[in-house]
Amino acid sequence: VDTAAFSSDLFDVLSRDLGFRTASDELRFDPKSIIDPFRTDLGYIRRAAFLTSCLKKTEVESDPYAESRALLSFLQANYTCKAWSLGVGHDPAIGFALEYARVMLRDWFEPQCGTQLVVNMASIEQAARFGPGVSLGMGRRPTQLYFKLGDSPMTAGTDFVRSWYEVSVRHNPLCEAAEMARKARHGPIDLTPVGSLSLQPKSYLTRRVCVTEPTCNTFFQLGLGEVMHRVLKQHTGIDFTVQPARNSMLAKWGSEYGIYATMDLKQCSDYIATGMVAYMFPRSVVQWVNALRTSDVNLKPYGLGDMNLGMVSTMGNGYTFALQTALLTAVLFGVYKTLDIPIERPCGA
């Protein structure tokens, strides 16, 4: 099947069925050009929204500038993160909301006036695991647990992470045996402090930036992410295992009754600066975030050298999603508190 011809014909049929004039097939990835911006009736807007979104997520066809556009956005985000500084302007409400968020994060992660540290070496190690993705040094080997644990080269970003993994596997006889077998086949854990950047299919217009990180780093990153997930679930009810279904329900209610709106934070993880995390989170969390992150990335395939990251992490890091969710949730609570808005969870959501 000719993918380009198929999507062109599909767009043409949809345009006619939805009541839009037939447009050139070259506009199928930018159908906004055929939509009347002055129409405000709900039925028209819904049809227009469907037409503008039905083909934009294709991963088969690609804009010739998609990769360069994604790389430029990543470089801009990294520059912004490096230049980050706290600036609340002259609005005391912003300062109050941020301070409330900081206090909330401290209460979550350092309860009982800081005498208890939720994020620590033991809690991270207990929750650590291997994920399904690829890691540095694996090459084209399968990413299943068997190969990561016992039959592939293994990498670590620092001596600390390497020694931590070597000690942690001794607590489980099966893991220790697997590591001994892996080491006999592939040698000791290699130090690889620089991550590898790649651009993965996302939509017609752009690509998703992912950084492949060392094996041992991702192992403990997922542990840190799980600890953060438990904290979120305990204090806010946010549960990553069911949250997508909840979000879909809320979006459906919002569409039907106009009581909710969804918001897409573009490149959110790329704009979480190291300075921002150091300011917002308690020190006991920041030290582990920094110890497990990959601070440099290799851009040589794109004509550049190694680059130091101003962002804490991006896609490919095991704690990225949990970290940004905790940060944004605390800030949201701070804004609600400042504006005196009660926080309520809809029934069934």
Predicted region positions:
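Non-catalytic, polymerase-adjacent accessory regions of viral genome-replication enzymes
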Residues: V1-S198
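Core nucleotidyl-transferase/polymerase catalytic module
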Residues: V1-S33, S163-A349
